[in-house]
UniProtKB/Swiss-Prot annotation:
EngB-type G domain ranges (all copies): 8-195
Record keywords: Cell cycle, Cell division, GTP-binding, Magnesium, Metal-binding, Nucleotide-binding, Septation
Binding site for GTP: 16-23, 41-45, 60-63, 140-143, 175-177
UniProt function note: Necessary for normal cell division and for the maintenance of normal septation.
Name of the featured protein: Probable GTP-binding protein EngB
Annotated organism of origin: Haloarcula marismortui (strain ATCC 43049 / DSM 3752 / JCM 8966 / VKM B-1809)
Gene name of this polypeptide: engB
Family annotation (InterPro entries): G_ENGB_dom, GTP-bd, GTP-bd_ribosome_bio_YsxC, P-loop_NTPase, Small_GTP-bd
GO biological process: cell division
Amino acid sequence: MFESRPDRDAEVVLIGRSNVGKSTLMREITGHTFDTGQRPGVTRSPNHFDWASADFVISDLPGFGFMKGVPEDVREEIKTDVVQYVERNAEHILVGILVVDGKSVIDIIDRHSGPDEIPHDVEMFHFLREVGVEPVVAVNKMDKVDDKDARLNELCDRLGLHPPWQQWQETIAPISAKHGSTEPLNEAVRHHLHEVQRDDLFQFF
């Protein structure tokens, strides 16, 4: 269980599988470099970044899902910790940024879809909605995707959102964190902050 959360009223969280670029995105949003492990699963506790002048924190939660060299029971424990963290702090979390790898997300979802299996990304998207946290899917590494519209439409379909993706721009945000191309995500987050009358937090996005 994660115990390190700063005492801040408002929060935005980054959630996602290992190796989807969460740490790069966190650095892009905050301008701050975090100590991240070279191997997936090394980061087992959240990275929090808060500003002294604002009652606000951004949290990068540990990556879940398959991690090479990490036992399955440890992977499940990390995922459980992430879920419990969100449940425990849901009333403070204004937006849940679900980061996925635009290049591989469809293959991963399809590989793990079956009668007895729900893909982690799909499960986490609906979980955020169930606990009252607005999800924004940051579809990262889109600079590596050729047919962007087709890929984003497929992702909408897998998440139960009726394509075309352009009608879901408050929920689906194609980005490339490595290249600093995050404006669609910033706009989506600002939309949800405005909905809860927190325009004062626009300065961070």
